[in-house]
């Protein structure tokens, strides 16, 4: 089982949805950084369940306890170990259906991989519950990046067929960034927000769920970060983004739309402005040859509908190898997309900080006076 990721900055995760706790170990955080716990807890709160009618009613405090690596609020350079206690499990919801493989979940694949020994309650180690660990680690990374004037902004680009405005030229707007972080459904267009909420409520009332797309922008990363081929910026980001259980697709810049265009339309032409190389457009999403060009890194992430729905579905009983019908009980999200937004921001922050510490550590150190 692969539970560690990173190069200079490493994250190891542990735990299961209905176990005692989930948590992680972050190795590689620079010493001497005074952490702002209010900042970190605000990021965690945006992911937290049970806050509105678009989310599961399961309530978890998502309060992380740091066990090492921070002393008097300042990083020591030692690994930061932390845990988040699970406090609101309804494990009995899963007893009657433990032999039924839930469609859209990792029940069957996990059963085959781990010979039936994996914890089936709430998805166990496969659960989106573990994104709380990714979010906490990424919130620390995001705080450090912001101290170096690198900012990450994400929003819900679409729910179903309803599409919000793109970030585009607004990516560097502190006002927009702050606004989105305060919203239950972080979208740019207030009109589209109404339609999205209606779609989510319609799915909920029909015992169904709905997916969408999250758009994310990273600004302030200097040119020259990344590598060609196997360690491209796209590869590194995608590797960790796909650790989010609901993610099923990623595109950078104009992505698949570029396949319909001509080069004259999507080549990001350049000029010198105030002595600096500037791109006149950003169709490639701030990355060329796997390396940053100082334009905003733009990517979109496809989020599938929450697979736990109360409708009757065909499945199999793995114990007696027979067909079966399952109706999933429990507390589930009619749309997970809004809660995924801070997770994607956090994952992006962790990867970007890892790359910066690997290739340009002085850039971070100098801005923190380390």
From Swiss-Prot:
<feature type="binding site">
    <location>
        <position position="47"/>
    </location>
    <ligand>
        <name>NADP(+)</name>
    </ligand>
</feature>
<keyword id="KW-0028">Amino-acid biosynthesis</keyword>
<protein>
    <recommendedName>
        <fullName>Chorismate synthase</fullName>
        <ecNumber>4.2.3.5</ecNumber>
    </recommendedName>
</protein>
<keyword id="KW-0057">Aromatic amino acid biosynthesis</keyword>
<comment type="function">
    <text>This reaction introduces a second double bond into the aromatic ring system.</text>
</comment>
<dbReference type="InterPro" id="IPR035904">
    <property type="entry name" value="Chorismate_synth_AroC_sf"/>
</dbReference>
<dbReference type="GO" id="GO:0004107">
    <property type="term" value="F:chorismate synthase activity"/>
</dbReference>
<comment type="similarity">
    <text>Belongs to the chorismate synthase family.</text>
</comment>
<comment type="subunit">
    <text>Homotetramer.</text>
</comment>
<dbReference type="InterPro" id="IPR020541">
    <property type="entry name" value="Chorismate_synthase_CS"/>
</dbReference>
<keyword id="KW-0456">Lyase</keyword>
<dbReference type="GO" id="GO:0008652">
    <property type="term" value="P:amino acid biosynthetic process"/>
</dbReference>
<keyword id="KW-0288">FMN</keyword>
<dbReference type="GO" id="GO:0005829">
    <property type="term" value="C:cytosol"/>
</dbReference>
<dbReference type="GO" id="GO:0009423">
    <property type="term" value="P:chorismate biosynthetic process"/>
</dbReference>
<keyword id="KW-0285">Flavoprotein</keyword>
<feature type="binding site">
    <location>
        <position position="289"/>
    </location>
    <ligand>
        <name>FMN</name>
    </ligand>
</feature>
<feature type="binding site">
    <location>
        <position position="331"/>
    </location>
    <ligand>
        <name>FMN</name>
    </ligand>
</feature>
<dbReference type="InterPro" id="IPR000453">
    <property type="entry name" value="Chorismate_synth"/>
</dbReference>
<dbReference type="Pfam" id="PF01264">
    <property type="entry name" value="Chorismate_synt"/>
</dbReference>
<dbReference type="GO" id="GO:0009073">
    <property type="term" value="P:aromatic amino acid family biosynthetic process"/>
</dbReference>
<feature type="binding site">
    <location>
        <begin position="125"/>
        <end position="127"/>
    </location>
    <ligand>
        <name>FMN</name>
    </ligand>
</feature>
<keyword id="KW-0521">NADP</keyword>
<feature type="binding site">
    <location>
        <begin position="304"/>
        <end position="308"/>
    </location>
    <ligand>
        <name>FMN</name>
    </ligand>
</feature>
<comment type="pathway">
    <text>Metabolic intermediate biosynthesis; chorismate biosynthesis; chorismate from D-erythrose 4-phosphate and phosphoenolpyruvate: step 7/7.</text>
</comment>
<keyword id="KW-0274">FAD</keyword>
<dbReference type="GO" id="GO:0010181">
    <property type="term" value="F:FMN binding"/>
</dbReference>
């Amino acid at each position: 089982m692969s539970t560690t990721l990173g190069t200079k900055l490493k994250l190891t995760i542990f735990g299961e949805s209905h176990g005692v706790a989930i948590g992680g170990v972050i190795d590689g955080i620079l010493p001497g950084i005074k952490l702002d716990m209010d900042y970190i807890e605000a990021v965690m709160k945006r992911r937290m369940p049970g806050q509105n009618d678009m989310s599961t009613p399961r309530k978890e405090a998502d309060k992380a306890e740091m066990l090492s690596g921070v002393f008097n609020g300042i990083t020591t350079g030692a690994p930061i170990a932390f845990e988040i206690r699970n406090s609101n499990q309804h494990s009995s919801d899963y007893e009657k259906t433990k032999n039924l493989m839930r469609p859209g979940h990792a029940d069957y694949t996990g059963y085959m991989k781990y010979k039936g020994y994996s914890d089936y309650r709430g998805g166990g180690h496969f659960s989106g519950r573990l994104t709380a660990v990714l979010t906490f680690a990424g919130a620390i990374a995001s705080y450090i990046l912001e101290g170096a004037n690198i900012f990450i902004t994400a929003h819900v680009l679409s729910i179903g067929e309803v599409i919000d405005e793109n970030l585009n030229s607004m990516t560097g707007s502190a006002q927009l960034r702050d606004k989105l972080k305060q919203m239950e459904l972080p979208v740019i267009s207030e009109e589209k927000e109404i339609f999205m909420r209606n779609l989510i409520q319609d799915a909920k009332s029909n015992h169904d769920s709905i997916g969408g797309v999250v758009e994310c922008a990273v600004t302030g990363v200097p040119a020259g970060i990344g590598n060609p081929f196997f360690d491209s910026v796209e590869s590194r980001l995608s590797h960790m983004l796909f650790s989010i259980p609901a993610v099923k697709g990623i595109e950078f810049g104009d992505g698949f739309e570029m396949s319909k265009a001509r080069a004259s339309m999507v080549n990001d032409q350049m000029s010198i402005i105030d002595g600096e190389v500037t791109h006149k457009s950003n169709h490639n999403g701030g990355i060329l040859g796997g390396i940053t060009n100082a334009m905003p890194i733009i990517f979109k992430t496809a989020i599938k509908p929450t697979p736990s729905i109360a409708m009757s579905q065909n499945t199999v009983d793995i114990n007696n190898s027979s067909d079966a019908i399952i109706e999933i009980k429990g507390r589930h999200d009619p749309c997970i997309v809004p809660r995924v937004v801070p997770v994607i921001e956090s994952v992006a922050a962790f990867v970007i900080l890892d790359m910066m510490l690997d290739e340009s550590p002085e850039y971070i150190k100098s801005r923190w006076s380390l």
